[in-house]
Regions:
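C-terminal motif of bacterial Sec signal peptides marking the signal peptidase cleavage site
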Residues: 17-20
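A structural "domain/chain start" motif
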Residues: 22-92, 199-204
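Soluble periplasmic/extracytoplasmic beta-strand elements of cell-envelope proteins
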Residues: 51-56, 71, 123-128, 144-150, ...
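Short secondary-structure boundary motifs at beta->alpha junctions and helix caps
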Residues: 69, 76-87, 156-194
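Structured, soluble extracytoplasmic/luminal domains of envelope-associated proteins
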Residues: 83-108
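Sec-exported extracytoplasmic/periplasmic mature domains
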Residues: 101, 105-109, 193-201
């Protein structure tokens, strides 16, 4: 029996389409920090400047991708592993930069980017050392954030401090890790505001 060419072509196309659908893996799930809630407590001392330039955070290259990483401290603490089907919707360096800027702005300080700043304005630089979910056991994990903050006026270093925060994850999965890392980032933002409030920034 003769089969028309157009019917054959359609059948082949359907086979390829079905084969492509069957070969696809699970659809990735994307996470972020969620909306920035109002600050639970207002720092007793506010930053000593009305305007602060905050540069985007720097960090290792693996934090400049959307992959979510975790460590099995009970098995091999030196190895970081990516989740197979879970992603950040924005690289962690960008997520952390935006959350810190939001928290500083909530304290009443006007926040500018480096492209909008005038010469001589106080500049805050952030260098991120770690941003990962750490498993102590197969069922217990925490989110850990560690960074170094440096405050400059012109080319002069005013002060520098390292901040580190950890918080328990509500579940031993990527969702729990995302929530714990968001909470740890908020805690560091609060610590950062307290530190800024203790500094004396000389005038130009």
């Amino acid at each position: 029996m003769h089969i028309p060419r157009n019917v054959t072509a359609l059948a082949l196309a359907a086979i390829f389409l079905l084969g492509g659908c069957a070969s696809r893996g699970p659809v990735p799930t994307f996470y972020d920090f969620g909306p920035a809630a109002p600050m639970a407590t207002v720092p007793e001392s506010t930053p000593p400047v009305p305007v602060l330039v905050i540069a985007d955070a720097n960090g290792p290259s693996w934090l400049d991708s959307q992959r979510m990483y975790y460590r099995l401290l009970y098995a091999d603490a030196q190895q970081s592993r990516p989740y197979a089907y879970n992603r950040w919707n924005t690289p962690p360096l960008q997520l952390l930069s935006q959350r810190l800027k939001t928290r500083v702005a909530q304290s009443g300080v006007k926040v500018l980017s480096t492209t909008d700043a005038a010469a001589g304005m106080p500049l805050l630089r952030i260098d991120v050392d770690d941003f990962s979910q750490n498993f102590d056991t197969q069922t217990q994990s925490s989110g850990h954030v560690s960074l170094r903050a440096s405050l400059f006026r012109g080319h002069r270093l005013i002060d520098q401090k390292t901040f580190s925060r950890s918080g328990p994850a509500g579940s031993a999965d990527a969702q729990g890790g995302a929530q714990a890392l968001a909470a740890a980032s908020d805690a560091i933002a609060s610590d950062l505001l307290v530190w800024l409030g203790t500094l004396t920034i000389p005038k130009e």
